[in-house]
Design a protein with these regions (language model features):
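Extracellular ligand-binding/catalytic regions of CAZymes and related secreted enzymes
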Residues: 4-17, 44, 177-181, 191-227
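Catalytic beta-strand/loop cores that center a nucleophilic Ser/Cys/Thr
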Residues: 124-196
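A glycine-rich, often tryptophan-bearing local segment used as a flexible ligand/cofactor-contacting loop or short
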Residues: 76-145
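His-enriched metal-coordination microenvironments in redox/metal-binding proteins
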Residues: 26-28, 100, 125, 179, ...
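Oxidoreductase and adenylate-handling cofactor-binding alpha/beta cores
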Residues: 113-119, 150-155, 159-166, 212-227
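Hydrophobic/aromatic beta-strand patches that form the interior of the parallel beta-sheet core
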Residues: 20, 97, 171, 197-199
């Protein structure tokens, strides 16, 4: 007999500012770090948090939340339903944090995502290892409580702004040891209708367990949620 059709169940929300974590895909332990660990950090800060790897659930739930944290790189997220939902979400003024894998050029059939929402993207990164993040604009709310520079063991993404896309404001950068150039690590996508924060860090526990990373994540969520 064929397997029963999977129904996309609605998520249950507790009172408070609602944060939807959207993950799933390849090359990362999404459940351990982007779900369980980041959820623990955000719940401890008083947020109502849910995580999904289901593009259909995410498309439906975006209408119910204050901020989304998008780390997914799975192909299912280029569905028309999710594209439309995310576009409406940002156009309505709701906040968006784009995290590590979400800043890749993941969806070849959805160029508008990188151009308009992410302001650019990455197609490569240094080998996993230690590097230094340097703060450029320490007075910005995204960098509240963050050291002027700190070391992290992570993937240094070669994120590059799209010259034809939504402009970005770089708040922190890192210099690659494996190719020429400085690359944005923390930035704002200057979308005309909402607040979008970009955080290229976060490959695994070496980042997610780091106090500086956790502070950046909390800052990104608070700023995009206008809290």
């Amino acid at each position: 007999a064929p397997a029963p059709e999977k129904k996309s169940a609605a998520l249950e929300w507790k009172p408070g500012t609602k944060i939807l974590l959207i993950g799933g895909g390849s090359s990362h332990d999404y459940q351990k770090w982007f779900n369980e660990y980041d959820t623990k950090v955000l719940v401890a800060a008083g947020y109502s948090v849910n995580y999904t790897e289901d593009a259909a659930v995410a498309a439906k739930e975006l209408a119910n939340v204050d901020t989304a944290v998008l780390s997914a790189n799975h192909g299912s997220f280029s569905s028309i339903a999710f594209r439309d939902s995310l576009t409406k979400f940002v156009d309505s003024g709701k906040g968006l944090v784009i995290l590590h894998p979400g800043l890749w050029y993941n969806w070849g059939d959805w160029a508008e995502y990188n151009k308009t929402i992410a302001g650019g993207g990455s197609r490569g990164h240094d080998r996993f290892g230690e590097f230094k993040v340097n703060i450029i604009k320490p007075d910005h709310p995204l960098l509240k409580g963050v050291n002027s520079s700190f070391s992290i063991t992570d993937e240094l993404y070669y994120y590059q702004p799209d010259p034809a896309g939504t402009p970005i404001e770089i708040l922190a950068s890192a210099t690659s040891t494996q190719r020429a150039g400085d690359y944005p690590q923390v930035f704002v996508v200057k979308h005309p209708k909402t607040r979008i924060a970009g955080l290229t860090l976060g490959h695994d526990g070496k980042a997610h367990e780091l106090a500086q990373y956790q502070q950046l994540l909390l800052n990104c969520v608070a700023w995009t949620a206008k809290k």
